[in-house]
Amino acid sequence: MSTRQYAFSWDYVGNVHDGRPNLGNSARIEVYRLFQYTLRDVIEARYGTAESEEVMRESGKLAGQKFCERFVGRRERFDDFVAAAQKALLDFGIGIMRIESADYETLHFTLTVAEDLDCSGLPDKDHTV
């Protein structure tokens, strides 16, 4: 059985307060996107488009789960969960989340995230980024 070296841990995020006492926890979005899209480029070149999309989707899901566990938490009421998620996304500068429609009987929800960290301001492409 192999031991994984990079299984996610908040230890990899580190103590930003101690590590960046002068620069703090902010960096420009261009730097975040530079890393994201060059990583995607390398994954696609090595494993193909379909696999790169799957890796990005899976890592985004894991990041969302970890973010939610740490910064949103469980709530008894759905409306309280949404409010906490909206606040966390706004506080971290990730985006402005809105519930556009909600059907509590079928549990179908449409939400949008305006000014999102990943792609707001990108030119339109003929494919999903």
For the regions a protein language model found, what residue spans apply to each?
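N-terminal accessory segment detector
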Residues: 1-128
